[in-house]
Amino acid sequence: MEFLSGYFLWVKAFHVIAVISWMAALFYLPRLFVYHAENAHKKEFVGVVQIQEKKLYSFIASPAMGFTLITGILMLLIAPEMFKSGGWLHAKLALVVLLLIYHFYCKKCMRELEKDPTGKNARFYRVFNEIPTILMILIVILVVVKPF
């Protein structure tokens, strides 16, 4: 990947853009789940929220996740020495795996809400909504501070 080494900062910039888009979607999607659960008895409202959930997941969250992964892997291929820069990168990658699990669990929640909107209450989704925020904070600290 030496031929791409001159483009590392461009790849990094697009990685940051993709991460911001992915995180925005992961912050908002569970909020839609809250509205869905709170208004399960309002079929018209639920219909609109379901469309929003599907579009957000399919057209924003998933492509942003894919682009985040592609640019992240590309950065590691361009600069494999980053693996030797300390444990912070390994910890960050572990947290990214947790974000991926969260992302796909959101799809599971969408399916569950579609089948039974009363399965989990709005409080569950409010707490669930905090997980990507915590992961993002930890990832940013690891990337910027590189504490180990």
Swiss-Prot record:
It is found in: Cell membrane. Keywords: Cell membrane, Heme, Iron, Membrane, Metal-binding, Oxidoreductase, Transmembrane, Transmembrane helix. Binds 1 heme b (iron(II)-protoporphyrin IX) group per subunit. The chain crosses the membrane at residues 7-27, 59-79, 86-106, 128-148. It holds the Pfam family UPF0093. PANTHER family: PROTOPORPHYRINOGEN IX OXIDASE, UPF0093 MEMBRANE PROTEIN SLR1790. This is Protoporphyrinogen IX oxidase.
